[in-house]
Amino acid sequence: MNAYLDISPEVQTALAAGEPVVALESTIISHGMPWPQNAETALQVEQIVRDNGAVPATIAIIKGRLKVGLSKEEIEYLGKAGLNVTKASRRDIPFIIARGGDGATTVASTMILAAMAGVKVFATGGIGGVHRGAQETFDISADLQELAHTNVAVICAGAKSILDLGLTREYLETHGVPLVGYQTSTLPAFYTRDSDFDVDYQLDTPEQIAQALQAKWEMGLQGGVVIANPIPEAYAMDRGKIDAAISAALAEMDDKGVSGKDSTPFLLAKVAEITGGDSLKANIQLVFNNAALAARIAASYYA
């Protein structure tokens, strides 16, 4: 076992017994919303995973230890620390460990820690991707590279709509990462149920998705799978309204010179401000929806 890794007793017991486990990321706790809403939301997501037949494993770095499965107290610790917690992707993990620090895991680093522990299914809000204007900036999320070679299925509401969805899709295709639509043939765009882009495959049941994952990994085809699960109709936002908010947020980001790992939190916060908090409510609901589907996929995978 990895000397830096702490797997919670509940998660360890489930993994040893071949029971379904769902990984959850921690950036949404530290960077996604303020205290105490962040911790409350994270605990609700864990409960939704349990209600749908799996064990939740929220993942983070706390005091220099890689944690797979957090206690309520650890979730609250991250929630209170908020933006003081380092947003940790692949490159950051060894340095946070070396200084005994705290890290909130992105999609990429959550996948890494999940794979270390043997967790195959991960629920998040949306994956990172190719940023708009990347042909000049080369700003491409490390999430995509992780998906290319780490064997974890990521259930999300598509790529965050602040990104260039077309280029994100092309990048995934280049790296052989399947883009699966759950009960949809078009790629959902986070706050909205559809976009101008198709998925590679539409699968309509958790069982079909689990069978495809088993076939992929049993054949030794390395890499993740993106399972795009549209936001529930009742919480989906108007496409025109959200596009206008994103355009305004992007313009302000350029004016202020925000870039790199700060760009996504800035844009999400600005879009929430412009939409009067509607985008944050939508974000929470799509995470709940993804957690439920991920638990059902994990239950089928381990059935």
UniProtKB/Swiss-Prot annotation:
Catalysed transformations (reactions): D-ribose 5-phosphate + uracil = psi-UMP + H2O
Active-site residues per Swiss-Prot or TrEMBL entry: E25, K160
Required co-factors: Mn(2+)
GO molecular function ontology, one term from the record: pseudouridylate synthase activity
Entry EC no(s): 4.2.1.70
Residues noted as binding Mn(2+) in the record, renumbered to the chain: D139
Keyword Cell membrane in annotation: no
Cofactor comment text: Binds 1 Mn(2+) ion per subunit.
Listed SUPFAM superfamilies: Indigoidine synthase A-like
Keyword Metal-binding set for record: yes
A GO cellular component entry from the record: cytoplasm
Keywords in alphabetical order: Glycosidase, Hydrolase, Lyase, Manganese, Metal-binding
Residues that hold substrate according to the record: K87, V107, S141, A142, D143
Highest taxon listed in the record's lineage: Bacteria
Subunit and partners: Homotrimer.
PANTHER family: CARBOHYDRATE KINASE PFKB DOMAIN-CONTAINING PROTEIN (PTHR42909:SF1), ZGC:136858 (PTHR42909)
UniProt xrefs under HAMAP family: PsiMP_glycosidase
Role this protein plays: Catalyzes the reversible cleavage of pseudouridine 5'-phosphate (PsiMP) to ribose 5-phosphate and uracil. Functions biologically in the cleavage direction, as part of a pseudouridine degradation pathway.
Name of the protein: Pseudouridine-5'-phosphate glycosidase
Native species: Hahella chejuensis (strain KCTC 2396)
